[in-house]
Amino acid sequence: MKLKNLYIENIRSYRKLDFTFEDGVTVISGVNGSGKSSLLEACFMGLFGSKILSKDFVLADMIFKGAETAKINLGFEHLGKEYLIEQAFRYSSKSENASSSKCVLYADGENIIDQATRTYEEVRTLLNMDEEAYRNCAYIRQGEIDVLINAKPKDRQRMIDDLLQLGKLEEYRERTGYAKTAVRRLERDTKNSLVGVKAEIEGIESTEPVKALNGLKQKAKETDGSLKELNEKKDYAAARKGELDLRIAEYRERLQEIEVLKEAIRKTQEDKAGCFKEKEAFSGEVQGQRRILLELGEENTGLRDDCGFGDLEIEALLLHQEKEESSAREKVNAVSKDLALLLKEGETGSQALCELEKEKTQAERTLLECRTSIGAANKEIEGYRENIRKLEEESKGLREKAGFKAASGAADEIALLIKEFEEKESLLRDRKNEASTKLGLSLKEKETCDLNLVELEKELQNAGAAVRKGSTEIEALEKELRENSKAVLDIQEQKSEVLAELKGLGFAADQLENLEDFSELLLENKSRLHGKEKELEATLRELENNIRKNRELFAAGKCPTCGQELKGSEIACTAEECEDKKEKLASELADIKVQHAELEKKITRLKDAKKLEKRISDYDIEIEKLQEKAKASGKLIETHRARIEEDALKLESLDKRKQELETSGRQLLSDIKTLQVQEAEARKAHIEGEKTLIEVKTLDRKLAENTAEIESLNGKIRTSLALIENYGERLGELNDKLKALAEKENLSKEKLKALELALEAAQKKENEAKKAHSESEKLLGQAKKLQANLLSMENIKHKISELEAAIRNLAEKVGFLDREILERSERIRQLGEKLEGNRLSELQQKRAQFEQAQAKITENIREKTEEKDSLLKEIGMLENSLKRLRELRKELKALENRQLYLEAVYSNAEELENTYIRVRADMRARNIGALSVLLNEMFAFMYTNNAYSHIELDPEYNLTVYRKDGTPLEPKLLSGGERAIFNLVLRCAIYRLLALGFGGDKADGLPPMILDEPTVFLDRGHIRQLLKLIDMMRSIGVGQIIVVSHDDSLIDSADHVFQVEKDPLTNMSSITRL
């Protein structure tokens, strides 16, 4: 992988920057705080986004202060493809938070991903590492130079395993472990399902469903035969009944047709008689019309002679007479108009006179009424005074009858008496109500007592039934407990046998929980021994090669290069040392193989122990279920016993309560009789007191009414006297009015006399005009009558011709009706012949017999059908049971296969888990070996002092530095510069190991190596070695190495140098190429 271009806006101290990366070594220098590390952080963030931020930083810290938007575009080349990541961020000044607004990944110019999380995942996939692995391998940040050294072994193991993709194997092993647990759970569930299915199969088979089904099918077959026979009989009866129905219907239709024909003949005869009558009527009408025609002709001749019309045409005659009548009518209208004016004037005068007369008459009538009213008022006053006297005498008599002497004190005495009687009546009413209330309460209490007795009887029955039911359930539960205890003992015996087998394998019961740990430990030991075995075999092969070469040299006698004798030389000593080392390694290898064989035996025993432990676990589960079931049954027994005791106590209390209620009921009956007597006496006394009170109140009311009536009559007398006075004043006014009306009446009469004379003259003129108009109107009427007679004569002639045609039509109709009567009489005769020999009653009797037989057969069919339905229902239930049995057997077979399958899956998962453990251990051993070789090689290359011999990296990733004298040291005890060298060497060794993983000693797939201030703790000599280390990394294929440093030697040796500066006024950084 190579970085190509970085474009940033508003990131840290950079306002805007477009930076191009070159191949080779690039050194970025500048003063402290100028923005060198910010440039590297921008590259890091361009790759992994906001995931690079630690918990002490937020995204807003990466954005230039005061800016609202920011952008990072990072272009890079990886495995032959060009990639570009565009990221944009938005800052909110209100919330003071920043968020990602855009994240797009392009490959060869094509948009492939447009989302932050997916882009992050794609970059992880491309580089085979996340941001943490990137920091631990390629990007050595400032201040994190000794992170790997100071990390705990577990953390260091995790970091390096993640880089080498070994963490995946551990993840797969954990998944396999989870799968084993799930399979074990499924296996247990399958076993429980097997038990349930077997129990259900046994329950169905115990009912012998096949035998019962055959018997029911035979019965159903017999029932079908009976039904078939009954249906045939029913069909025969229905067919016979249908035939009779048809014959009866045909008989009835013929009778009905005969009646219809007779009725038609009767109607035809009536129509014929009607035709004769109509013909006679038409003939008479023709004769009458001819007579009328003759009379009209004679009348017309007489009219012409009388009126002098002569032989004029009727139209000319009518026109002449209409003109004369119109002239006479106009004269009459003119005279009538003048007469109407005079009449109107006369009417007005007469009306005025009438009104005066009416007014005068009204005044006289009013005068008379006033005089009459005065007399009547005087008579009323006398009557009122007579009524007052009678009422006073009646009141006096009532008071004397009641024993009151004076009228003045009688009202007070009556009031006192009424009050006394009211108090007495109230007391008696209270006594009556009290007695009624007590009686009602007693009756209600008696009713409640009876209801309680009924409820107690029901409760007694329910309690007894509950006691019996509880006893039955206790017996069933105790039986179940005994069976449960027996099953527990059987399972415990089986468990004891399994424990004995487990003990024979050398495992105690308390060690079962640690079997998984033992298994993992043994597998790790096996893997470790396997790794040592392979390492010793490789070393032995190398020693054997060396020994063989030395022997060949010894056989030659001289060194082939310098020609020196080999006896006694250093090569001879080395050969002896190799022989000794070979014997040692062979012995160690044999010991390891023995240990390996023992481990295999232990693993085999452990597998057997695991199987036994699984059986023990299953037994424990079954025992636990049975114990829980027994506990539940025990609780139910205790519950039932407690309920039985409660019900027994309840029975006793109910019996006691029943006796109390019966005693209370008898006492209540006695009390009710006494209260009924008391209530009757109180009611009688109250009625008598109430009667006396009513009489006294009636007397008081009557006296009060008489007094009020007297007062009313005195008021009326006063009113009448006032009316008499008013009537006197009215009489004077009316007399004055009558005098004025008499004067007006005389003037009106004189005016009317003059109008009467003028009216007589106008009426005379009108009579003469009317007479002339009447004569002309009479002549016009005679002319119109002559015209009407002529028209009538034409109509009569036309009518006579129509009547003669109708007479001819009626004669033809009579002939047609005679033919119809003959045809229908013949049809009646034919139908009568067909009906002979068939009697309706006989047919109906036969039909009733067949209908009764059909109903009886239908009832038999219904009973047989119900019987068949019941059989079919039972057959269906049995077939369902057999179907369920087949399904259960299939399910049983499937469950058995599933159990075998799950056992195989569990075994495979266990084997797979062991394989993952073994592979991980093997790969870790190989990686540790390779990493150790690379680490020591680079440490020897980098470290200029000779104080340390080598570095050891054990299987647990513990790092140990050895001095020349063999003394081990912890890396954290080294000096700062030594730790820096050690960290650089370790990072470069990991980088080289990863390069080997990408295919040979090439780093094409790895990101550029970035070193941020690597020379902080290094002296001049080690800085020169750092330059050599950088050259070595270039030689193994690292295409880009980016270093941030102030050191001149690094700057001088770099391929590309850039200077970073910051403007102190704007606080913005910029970069220039040197």
From Swiss-Prot:
Q: Entry's PANTHER family?
A: ABC TRANSPORTER ABCH.3
Which Pfam families does this entry report, sorted A to Z? SMC_N
**Name of encoding gene:** rad50
Please name the GO terms of the biological process aspect recorded for this protein, alphabetically.
DNA repair; double-strand break repair
Q: What does this protein do?
A: Part of the Rad50/Mre11 complex, which is involved in the early steps of DNA double-strand break (DSB) repair. The complex may facilitate opening of the processed DNA ends to aid in the recruitment of HerA and NurA. Rad50 controls the balance between DNA end bridging and DNA resection via ATP-dependent structural rearrangements of the Rad50/Mre11 complex.
Q: Which InterPro entries match?
A: P-loop_NTPase, Rad50_ATPase_archaeal, RecF/RecN/SMC_N, Zn_hook_RAD50
Protein family per UniProt = Belongs to the SMC family. RAD50 subfamily.
Mention one GO molecular function: ATP hydrolysis activity
Q: Domain text from the record?
A: The two conserved Cys that bind zinc constitute the zinc-hook, which separates the large intramolecular coiled coil regions. The 2 Cys residues coordinate one molecule of zinc with the help of the 2 Cys residues of the zinc-hook of another Rad50 molecule, thereby forming a V-shaped homodimer.
Q: What is this protein called?
A: DNA double-strand break repair Rad50 ATPase
Q: Which residues bind ATP?
A: 12, 32-38, 142, 973-978
| Superkingdom, taxonomy of origin | Archaea
The record's Gene Ontology cellular component field reads: DNA repair complex
Regions annotated as coiled coil:
355-402, 452-506, 574-611, 649-678, 749-823, 865-895
Cofactors that this protein relies on: Zn(2+)
Task: Tell me the ranges covered by the Zinc-hook domain, including all copies.
Answer: 512-611
Recite the UniProt keywords alphabetically. ATP-binding, Coiled coil, DNA damage, DNA repair, Hydrolase, Metal-binding, Nucleotide-binding, Zinc
The record ties this protein, via SUPFAM superfamilies, to: P-loop containing nucleoside triphosphate hydrolases (SSF52540), Rad50 coiled-coil Zn hook (SSF75712)
Q: Taxonomy-wise, where does this protein's organism fall, top ranks first?
A: Archaea, Methanobacteriati, Methanobacteriota, Stenosarchaea group, Methanomicrobia
The record's note on quaternary structure and interaction partners says: Homodimer. Forms a heterotetramer composed of two Mre11 subunits and two Rad50 subunits.
Q: How is the cofactor bound?
A: Binds 1 zinc ion per homodimer.
Which residues are recorded as binding Zn(2+)?
A: C559, C562
